[in-house]
Amino acid sequence: MSNAFQISRNLWELKMGMVNAYLLETMDGLVLIDAGWPNKTDTIFSAVQDSGLDPKDIRHLVLTHGHIDHAGSAAEVLQRTGARSYAHTADLDLINEGKAEDPGTSVTLGIIPKIVYLLFIKPGGTTYKAFAVDQTLSLERSYRFDQ
């Protein structure tokens, strides 16, 4: 069963369980959008291979935000591919410290989120491996990865 679903000619959804990542094929190589939970790099790379592409061609990693379910495997993806990383300025503190969430975040939405919280978030905070962001992103400009 493939863990890559082709959305358009050059865009794939990479299925990783509770969260997904996306893969964009550009003239400059592959752009991975998000890196899932910690220890999911092999799952990501397997899904990239399911798309018919090579994980070694990942040149850019764009994080939608710095929470553990989107940035957890980022450090390992970057280390194994040599890709450049991109994140919004507002997430730099989380990413630089490898923190799962802003310390002020609390779960109050019912039993299912509480169960997820208890299973995946350690009391006092869950961490992932911190890494350096190569370039910050702003929603006020556009970006091209094919130059």
Task: List where the protein language model places each region.
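Hydrophobic/aromatic beta-strand patches that form the interior of the parallel beta-sheet core
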Residues: 12, 62, 86, 135-137
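Short loop segments at secondary-structure junctions
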Residues: 27-29, 83, 140
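Pre-active-site segment of Zn-dependent metallo-hydrolases
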Residues: 31-61, 105-106, 127, 133
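Metallo-beta-lactamase
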Residues: 92-147
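Active-site metal-binding motif and surrounding structural segment of the metallo-beta-lactamase
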Residues: 41-87, 91
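A generic local structural motif
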Residues: 17-19, 46-50, 71-72, 123, ...
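Conserved beta-strand hairpin/beta-sheet module of binuclear metal-dependent hydrolase folds
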Residues: 2-51
